[in-house]
Amino acid sequence: MELDVVAATQDVLTTATGYYSPVDASKLDDDFVFRAPTIGPLNKQDYINTMTTLETYVGYPDITPNAFGFTQDPDEPLKCIFWTRATGTFTQPWNPYGKKLEALRIQPNGKTAKLPTECYSMTFTPEGKVRYLTAGYVVSKVEGNTAGFGAVLALFVNADLPQVAQIALDANVRAVGGWIANNVDSSVAKTVSNPEDLPAWYRAVEPPPAQ
């Protein structure tokens, strides 16, 4: 039977991505890759570790994607493109930094984040597992109340930590974070996988930068 990519996408979005609910690794292909504007590429294990560390749904238990416009790609029938306009209220203590950094747990402020419209896509295997997830591509930075930031960075802005969102845009800072995750504390969220740890299919389409 042909895969209903719209139904599959709607299911994964709300039950498996690690942003709105805990990660469900069983719905991700072994050759899974995640890509966002400043985060990624992340392979399956690094993505699971990162989202398990961030636990956005803990600090924002009512976070919802408010997704719309689910469309099967006419050229790639196993790909679904859609948009989100997420909302969520910061009502619970949140530690997105890593379990060894419990002292940095952020206390809730009761503010509701209204994120701008973001474009996402999911590409599946014929068996119905997600092979490629793209996320957080903001359509208009003048929407919402998170200073134009989307995805996790928007939640930092809403938590009165806009400086964290700004710092995360710095490639050098992300590189330091990756070194810490690799060498000091594996619970720290990675922003990119080591090139050699990415699936062959992804390395073929986006080769690592020359050293």
Regions found by a protein language model. Give the residues of each.
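C-terminal and inter-domain tail/linker signature
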Residues: 1-211
